[in-house]
Amino acid sequence: MALERSDVEKIAHLARLGLSEADLPRTTETLNNILGLIDQMQAVDTSGVEPLAHPLEATQRLRPDAVTETDHRDAYQTIAPAVEEGLYLVPKVIE
């Protein structure tokens, strides 16, 4: 499936991208190359290949889930401009 110039213009509009007239041919070619690579990968026969999440059978050593630091909330909130009941107060952004 090859993209046309109009397809790239529509995609750019939907993505809120400003592409100049000079950028459109190069962007169209780049996107078509990417789609061509995806087509090549989809054409590979992977039947009989076991799906895997990690190529190595390795496990990570995890530390115990225990509190290792003391609570510093009060010290951190002393420099905050506004605090109420242990929560930081911030200006309203969305009405």
Swiss-Prot record:
What this chain does, per the entry, is described as: Allows the formation of correctly charged Asn-tRNA(Asn) or Gln-tRNA(Gln) through the transamidation of misacylated Asp-tRNA(Asn) or Glu-tRNA(Gln) in organisms which lack either or both of asparaginyl-tRNA or glutaminyl-tRNA synthetases. The reaction takes place in the presence of glutamine and ATP through an activated phospho-Asp-tRNA(Asn) or phospho-Glu-tRNA(Gln).
Could you state a single Gene Ontology molecular function term?
A: ATP binding
EC code(s) of this entry: 6.3.5.-
User: What is the protein's name according to its record?
Assistant: Aspartyl/glutamyl-tRNA(Asn/Gln) amidotransferase subunit C
| Keywords carried by this UniProt record | ATP-binding, Ligase, Nucleotide-binding, Protein biosynthesis
A Gene Ontology biological process noted in the UniProt record is:
translation
InterPro entries xref list: Asp/Glu-ADT_sf_sub_c, GatC
Q: Residue span of the signal peptide, if any?
A: none
Where, by residue number, does the polypeptide cross the bilayer?
none
Reactions listed under catalytic activity: L-glutamyl-tRNA(Gln) + L-glutamine + ATP + H2O = L-glutaminyl-tRNA(Gln) + L-glutamate + ADP + phosphate + H(+); L-aspartyl-tRNA(Asn) + L-glutamine + ATP + H2O = L-asparaginyl-tRNA(Asn) + L-glutamate + ADP + phosphate + 2 H(+)
Q: Name one Pfam family in it.
A: GatC
Q: What class of enzyme is it?
A: ligase
Q: Which HAMAP family match?
A: GatC
Describe the protein's quaternary organization and the partners it interacts with: Heterotrimer of A, B and C subunits.
Q: Per the record's keyword annotation, is Protein biosynthesis included, yes or no?
A: yes
What family is reported?
Belongs to the GatC family.
